[in-house]
Amino acid sequence: MTRTAVLLLTLLFLVAMAASDKIKTREVCWTEEECENWE
């Protein structure tokens, strides 16, 4: 594997983690105010 491929995979992984994090918070709270309280 080249260094570029590893870098791209890492970025993809981080983006996926961030996205799943957002989805989890969305399930817990319905308004922005509630979301801020959860952080």
UniProtKB/Swiss-Prot annotation:
Main subcellular localisation: secreted
Keywords: Disulfide bond, Neurotoxin, Secreted, Signal, Toxin
Coiled-coil ranges per UniProt: none
GO molecular function: toxin activity
Disulfide partners: 29-35
Cellular localization per UniProt: Secreted
GO cellular component: extracellular region
Tissue: Expressed by the venom duct.
Signal peptide from the UniProt entry: 1-20
Free-text note regarding domains: The cysteine framework is C-C.
Functional description taken from the UniProt entry: Probable neurotoxin.
Name this polypeptide is given: Contryphan-Cal1
